[in-house]
């Protein structure tokens, strides 16, 4: 099996800006190339774009914007699994010999259409992610006797880590009491329990072992990869306290 590494990365700040998706993709890709001068764009065999945005033809557009003429160029959409799907696809292209170096760029806007699923009747009238999250939260709290205070600790930890990330949309820290006192959105989730929709992009380059070593002195090697789809809706879940697909993917990796 061909050894595959993550040789380079680039990102934008995540904001509430109203930038077009094409512009956002370009910014993270440009950041990647600015920070990795050893990459020869002529060596990039494929460009994959990961997004829930409804814009079309994004991969060829991005390729032209950054001066790449790849053999393979296409977009990948699978809601919150889009980024993982892109990495699995790129890994497979390289492992099979169809490509040696691949640029993957993911981007979303604050108004992503992926926030609402009109097709899924199993959710009834509750089509926004806050309601899906609330179903899992209520079930988990009931199953494991989790209090609202203990749940709030997760948000406190996440905001503390975000403050250390210069590209994060949130740069504030909060206490458990702050989270508890924030606006109630559902019976089990408050405003500060939730992540904020934002506009931003990140890009990475995957490559064969030889090319990865020629680009980076400190690459990340993909030593295992796994993926699993159990269903698109909630109806096939064994319970609402865990994600069986996540467990299966981890075991596969």
Pin down the residues of each PLM region.
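Conserved active-site "lid/cap" helical segment
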Residues: 1-81, 89, 140, 144-147, ...
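Short acidic, glycine/serine/threonine-rich loops at helix termini
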Residues: 18-19, 113-118, 163-166, 234-235
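Hydrophobic pocket-lining residues that define ligand/cofactor binding sites across diverse proteins
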Residues: 33, 93-94, 212
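Short coil/turn connectors at secondary-structure junctions
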Residues: 1-4, 42-45, 69-72, 96-102, ...
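Conserved thiamine diphosphate
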Residues: 128-170
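Condensing-enzyme catalytic core mediating Claisen C-C bond formation in acyl metabolism
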Residues: 1-19, 23, 152-153, 184-252
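Conserved catalytic cysteine-centered active-site region
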Residues: 51-105, 109-133, 170-194, 223-230, ...
């Amino acid at each position: 099996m061909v050894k595959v590494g993550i040789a380079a990365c680039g990102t934008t700040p995540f904001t509430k800006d109203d930038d077009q998706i094409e512009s956002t993709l370009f910014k993270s890709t440009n950041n990647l190339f600015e920070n990795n001068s050893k990459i020869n764009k002529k060596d990039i065999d494929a460009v994959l774009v990961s997004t829930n945005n409804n814009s079309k033809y994004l991969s060829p557009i991005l390729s032209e914007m950054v001066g790449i003429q790849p053999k393979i160029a296409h977009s990948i959409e699978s809601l919150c699994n889009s980024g993982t799907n892109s990495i699995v696809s790129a890994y497979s292209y390289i492992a099979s010999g169809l490509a040696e170096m691949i640029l993957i760029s993911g981007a979303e806007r604050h108004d992503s259409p992926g926030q609402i699923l009109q097709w899924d009747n199993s959710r009834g009238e509750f089509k926004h992610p806050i309601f899906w999250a609330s179903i899992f939260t209520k079930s988990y709290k009931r199953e494991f006797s989790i209090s609202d205070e203990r749940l709030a600790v997760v948000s406190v930890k996440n905001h503390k880590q975000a403050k250390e990330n210069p590209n994060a949309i949130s740069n504030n820290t909060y206490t458990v009491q702050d989270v508890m006192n924030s606006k109630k959105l559902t019976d089990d989730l408050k405003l500060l329990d939730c992540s904020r929709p934002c506009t931003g992009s990140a890009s990475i380059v995957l490559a064969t072992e030889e090319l990865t070593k020629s680009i980076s002195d400190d690459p990340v090697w993909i030593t295992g990869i796994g993926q699993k789809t159990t269903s698109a809706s909630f109806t096939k879940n064994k319970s609402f306290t865990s994600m069986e697909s996540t467990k299966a993917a981890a075991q596969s990796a």
